[in-house]
Amino acid sequence: MHEPRLWVKRLVIWEKPGEQPLRDVPLRPGLNIVWTPDDNGIGHGGGKTLFCRLLRYCLGEDKFAPEDQRDGIGSAFPNGWVGMEVVLDGTCWAVLRPLGIRRRHFAVPNGNLDELILSEMPTTGLSPLLNSIEDNLLTPGVRDLIAGKKQGH
């Protein structure tokens, strides 16, 4: 069985660097079912939507939640971080983004997420990962379409 070209291996949430993660969710190639025990019978409040939004945030989306929720999470976790290990063509990238006050963003090939959260390395931004995804996965037609949107067409 071949591994997918792009897949998320792990999502981690820290209240602050140096502490044990609040959540460390391992994933595997293929279908992963995200569920929570349904104590009230309605399935709300388990964090499934936020989990998906955090994945998108680590893959380059600007915001991980609507403004009121971001403000609440930022107030509760002013030093909070979310990290993701994403595998692209066999290379595991470590991605780290802030949850609280504005800080640095990182995307490091062959990086170790547990070491990256503690490091003082210079900011990389997400461009290294996003450029690698664009260069390695997207067809020329899709790349041209994205370039047109970036230029305002």
Question: What does each of the following model-derived ranges do?
Answer:
Residues M1-R97, H105:
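Extreme N-terminal "head/tail" segments of very large remodeling/mechanoenzyme assemblies
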Residues I101-H153:
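Glycine-rich phosphate-binding loops of NTPases
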